[in-house]
């Protein structure tokens, strides 16, 4: 089996980002981004997706977190697209429900080749530890656009914003794990009746 790894660099006037992933990893993660709450959430993707992630970023954090959060999503999406290759043999679809105390979120993903995001998370607060939670929409939009996936994110219950976000990222990691997993019965086959994704 070919290694499903990728390294991507994104260099703009706003951010400089390096991301490396291993889709067949063990959940190892290393981050140097400068946005602690984002790093905490990315760790959920790695651990629950069993995907090795290594991301470094230097950005205009003196302005705010927006460009860094969005560009990390873009770069991670590019890395996924590169690592997954032609998509032959993958399960393609993934889904997960994850609870955390009172919060419950559902994430469904399709490596369809068609970018689309439906995100319905009624945050109960605007910030967590100084982090603007609206930026997670920018993160996921960047990921979707560059991984070329359809992604549905719904928080079904929850009153604690930290719990809402954490359940989203844990479910996202688990859905990714399911979708990128190789299916022995589909070896070498495209998971689409069109023959292409």
UniProtKB/Swiss-Prot annotation:
Lineage: Bacteria, Pseudomonadati, Pseudomonadota, Gammaproteobacteria, Pseudomonadales
Gene: hisB
Protein's pathway: Amino-acid biosynthesis; L-histidine biosynthesis; L-histidine from 5-phospho-alpha-D-ribose 1-diphosphate: step 6/9
The protein's Enzyme Commission number: 4.2.1.19
Protein's UniProt name: Imidazoleglycerol-phosphate dehydratase
Keyword Disulfide bond: no
One Gene Ontology molecular-function label: imidazoleglycerol-phosphate dehydratase activity
PANTHER family registered for this protein in UniProt: IMIDAZOLEGLYCEROL-PHOSPHATE DEHYDRATASE, IMIDAZOLEGLYCEROL-PHOSPHATE DEHYDRATASE HIS7
Organism of origin: Pseudomonas fluorescens (strain ATCC BAA-477 / NRRL B-23932 / Pf-5)
Keywords, alphabetical: Amino-acid biosynthesis, Cytoplasm, Histidine biosynthesis, Lyase
């Amino acid at each position: 089996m070919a290694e499903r790894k990728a390294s991507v660099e994104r260099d703009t006037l706003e951010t400089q980002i390096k991301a490396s992933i291993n889709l067949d990893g063990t959940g190892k993660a290393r981050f140097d981004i400068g946005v602690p709450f984002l790093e905490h959430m990315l760790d959920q993707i790695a651990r629950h997706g069993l995907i090795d992630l290594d991301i470094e970023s230097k950005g205009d954090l003196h302005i705010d977190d927006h460009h860094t959060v969005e560009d990390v999503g873009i770069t991670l999406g590019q890395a996924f697209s590169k690592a997954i290759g032609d998509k032959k043999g993958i399960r393609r679809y993934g889904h997960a429900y994850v609870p955390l105390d009172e919060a419950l979120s559902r994430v469904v993903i399709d490596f369809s080749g068609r970018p689309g995001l439906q995100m319905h998370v009624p945050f109960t607060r605007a910030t967590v530890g100084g982090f603007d939670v609206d930026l997670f929409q920018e993160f996921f939009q960047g990921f979707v656009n560059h991984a070329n996936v359809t992604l549905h994110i719904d928080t079904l219950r929850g009153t604690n914003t930290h719990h809402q976000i954490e359940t989203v990222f844990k479910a996202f990691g688990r859905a990714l794990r399911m979708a990128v997993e190789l299916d022995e019965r589909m070896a070498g086959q495209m998971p689409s009746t069109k023959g292409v994704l």
